[in-house]
Amino acid sequence: MRGKFPAGRCGASAAPAVAKGAVEMAVRVHLVAMLVAAGLMLGGCARQSPQPSAPGAGAGPVIGGLGKSIHPFWDQVEKGMRDAAEPRGIQVEFYVPTKEDARKQAEKIKSWVAVGVSGILFAASDPETVGPAIRDAAARRIPCVAMDTDAPDSGRLAYVGTDNYEAGKVAGRVLGDLLKGRGKVCIATGSLTASNSLERIRGFREVLTKEYPGITVLPEVLVDNEDRAVAEQKAKAKIAAEPDLAAFFGVYALNGPACANAVKSAGKQGKIRVVCFDTTAEHMNMLKSGMIDAAVGQRPYLMGKKGLELVALIIEKGPEQALREMGAKDGSIDTGVDVVRREDVEKYRARLKQLGIPVEGW
């Protein structure tokens, strides 16, 4: 099932993606049973996706997908993975902790390594905590690809997702123009350890400092560890503490809606602006109602789809050829972003549908 790579390298060459023969079928039966057991051990604190189908139903290689928290963003990533996996005869086990928890992520990776999954597509909440588990997987010749948030020192073979530094700059310009170059801004995020959050904040601050000197970005960043209740409470407290606050910048998917709800509760909708990342159904509905002013839409479905396609291709052909065929640049595949304002919602929806990306709830 797993590609047989030369010692010391993860993915220099590979066995066929779908193994044949009675011996390997027995191995598959054993693997799926162990995956089920591993899932049960970790299931009390996380949303565990349905287990792979029985080997008799056409079982193939198993690829683990690791998200960061329970949220519709990760539902889209999972769907992208499963849509790419089905025609390839690949099984997907997708796992997210209830909220950001790098320790639980590392435990899950270790369980996948123990049962010998064929590949791993992961988003590390804290690369320092998750990195050792990924390095161990790589040492055992399991191809690992980072998605959404990069972990370049982890031993991963590639990154699939947003160029977060550039996307942060995009968000900064959107908010700078919205405020006409003046005002006080607060940043809210789910993490100050994940690289995607840090890179977005870096790009955002850099643009406002250089291009919008009349805007003040408050030094304190609100951090909620992707806990919605905490995010709203901290945003409400900041509104009370800063009566002249002009805007929130929501770095993670839950931050925009959380800040928007806090603004509405304070009776300051239209006075305090909200610019944020991501375009789930909740974001789109808040854009339509005016609670969110603009969203920088990532493409989570494509992260899952392209990420799985890349892992599968690495298993089949090795990393160098796989990255070349997937059009990677410097080991990365940029899935891009879209800026969506209230007037863009229906056009954006039509574009997603045309691309075959699921659109539900808005």
Residue ranges and their predicted role:
Residues 90, 116-119, 140-144, 155, ...:
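Loop/turn elements at helix/coil->beta-strand transitions in domains of secreted/extracellular proteins
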Residues 1-62, 135-142, 361-362:
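Short, low-complexity disordered leader/linker segments with a strong preference
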Residues 113, 175-180, 239, 307, ...:
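Short, hydrophobic alpha-helical segments
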Residues 66-79, 94-104, 126, 149, ...:
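Hinge/beta->alpha junction and helix N-cap segments in small-molecule ligand-binding domains
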Residues 113, 122-138, 204, 219, ...:
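Hydrophobic alpha-helical
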Residues 45, 54-59, 195-196, 207-209, ...:
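Hinge/cleft segment of the Venus flytrap/periplasmic-binding protein
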